[in-house]
Amino acid sequence: MPDMSQLKELPFSTLQFYATAPYPCSYLPGRQARSQVAAPGHLINTGTYSQLVEQGFRRSGLFTYRPHCDNCHACVPVRVDAARFEPNRTQRRAWRSHQALRAFVAELAWSPEHYDLYTRYQQGRHPGGGMDEDSRTQYAQFLLTTRVNTRLVKFRTPQGQLAMISIIDVLDDGLSSVYTFYDPDMAGSLGTYSILWQIEQCRTLDLPWLYLGYWIADSRKMAYKANFRPLQMHVDGAWRETPP
């Protein structure tokens, strides 16, 4: 990864923003989506990206964007207040059921073992979604390319079996949960456990927020995010806490 330290003092105003052409929405069938993209990408270091995330942006590989759809505002950026978070009964059960897992924090790196788990996860949990056919190159572009402070966290069983991987960006004011994939045959709400683990990491690092990307009220795939409270939503240019 290139050294971006010399760009730390560049002002946020050096970036430009453009809107993409419409494309099929990945979350709401029959809808067209557009994105607002921040460019040039080589100026987006961790400090700049932290500011962008605070304004509702997200990244996919080196592509930094936020929804910019015509006549639709369904995608809402959300973040969890880590210090005030209180798990519900289901979340406490998920936390207890995976206490035997061991987490190993590492730099981003290609691994056939990781790619195999990613493929099994996509085929088991999201068949026919397109990502279940991702090549090695597509996987690497999606999860292993970054210009910000990113970590790969491996979760293994006591026997050494790889159970889950979480890709996490370390921001100035929190952690951003980029993507998590896990063994589809392993029971016990691994996805929930990953978020709980990341909240604990925020507390350990004294970072106030865990950014969870976008929540969509009409998307079943996104519904779980509303279960982590206190939750703030970025609406009309400001973060607002959702009612309990």
UniProtKB/Swiss-Prot annotation:
Its EC number is 2.3.2.29. One of its GO terms (cellular component) is cytoplasm. GO terms for molecular function: arginyl-tRNA--protein transferase activity; leucyl-tRNA--protein transferase activity. Its main location: cytoplasm. The keyword Cell membrane does not apply. GO terms for biological process: ubiquitin-dependent protein catabolic process via the N-end rule pathway. SUPFAM superfamilies: Acyl-CoA N-acyltransferases (Nat) (SSF55729). Keywords: Acyltransferase, Cytoplasm, Transferase. It catalyses: N-terminal L-glutamyl-[protein] + L-leucyl-tRNA(Leu) = N-terminal L-leucyl-L-glutamyl-[protein] + tRNA(Leu) + H(+); N-terminal L-aspartyl-[protein] + L-leucyl-tRNA(Leu) = N-terminal L-leucyl-L-aspartyl-[protein] + tRNA(Leu) + H(+). The keyword Acyltransferase applies. InterPro entries: Acyl_CoA_acyltransferase, Asp_Glu_LeuTrfase, N-end_Aminoacyl_Trfase, N-end_Aminoacyl_Trfase_C, N-end_Aminoacyl_Trfase_N. It is found in: Cytoplasm. Functions in the N-end rule pathway of protein degradation where it conjugates Leu from its aminoacyl-tRNA to the N-termini of proteins containing an N-terminal aspartate or glutamate. Belongs to the R-transferase family. Bpt subfamily. This is Aspartate/glutamate leucyltransferase. It comes from Bordetella parapertussis (strain 12822 / ATCC BAA-587 / NCTC 13253).
